[in-house]
Amino acid sequence: IWATVTNFGERPGINGKLQRFADEVYRASNSEYAKYMKGVGILPEGINNNPVTYELLLELVWHKDRVDVDQWIESYVTARYGRITDEIRTAWKMMLKSIYSSEVGYQEGPPENILCARPALELKSVSSWGRLAKKYDRDLYKKAAFLFAKAMPEFNEVRTYRIDLIHFLRQVIANEADSVFYDMITAYQEKKVEKFEQEVSRFLMMIDTENELLAQDPFFRLSTWQQQAKDAGNTAAEKKNNFHNLMMLITYWGEHVTSEDNLHDYAYKEWAGMMNTYYKERWLVYFDYLRALLRGEEAKAPDYFHWEREWVEKNLHMADDAPRMSLEEIVNKVTDR
């Protein structure tokens, strides 16, 4: 079986080397080993992201000829949204040249979001085996996402469009947060207090903006998954255990032993109800620590190992993650319209 692992821990983010997937399956099925090849499969640790990747991979087995993804994407988009427009078509073609391009190199799942990282002055990943670096053309991707958003008046009632719109704009925020973080840390290191506070405010505002964006659909709300965890239990004890396990898995993933600390954020989630609580609160703890150092005080570095576990125990309840704005309002805010 030709297969690929495209996701670890069902971590969020957009990625998929679509043309490379198509070319590699075609190459394998026409090689000297073709007689041993019995099919095409997917091996992700979660499938609630990047649907285009799975749609393509699981369709390839039915194609004898090489698939040109630039052409294939039109049929995919038409099927996903019920119809296609010039704006939608152009936006997706731009994504094929940016976020869905076949960049060279190995990576374990999508590039990550620094807003969700355990705070530090230097950050290269959120999870231990992930990466923050985005190697595609981020400016082109942003243009594609904003163009996709322009179709909202026509596609607002199509849920698959809304889910993709939220996901695409969420990625724009994640991408731009990298530079805000850099400016913030630079200001701290240069002891420019006023500039540091300005960038901290921008950083926290990005967390709040993303939280409101994600709240626009139940698919991106923590409460949706909390309810599923509870519903999977048959008894009160099972429901309670499932609920705790969910909150543990999406935060620190482990027991109360420091040797397991490398699994923190392995299955981090960008969900409404997580962005404005867990991730924001963790950053606030860090910013207070940096402020103390800027004042010349002796301050103890945050103990995230215990803080994360205490946070889970204090938040074993349904999240308050309902939207406060309309989808149109938050989309206009993200796209500066």
Residue ranges, per PLM feature:
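Generic detector of short, locally flexible boundary/turn motifs and exposed helical patches
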Residues: 2-8, 148-151, 161
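Catalytic-core regions of glycoside hydrolase
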Residues: 1-96, 100-105, 109-112, 116-138, ...
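Long, amphipathic alpha-helical regulatory blocks in the mid-to-C-terminal portion
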Residues: 135-158
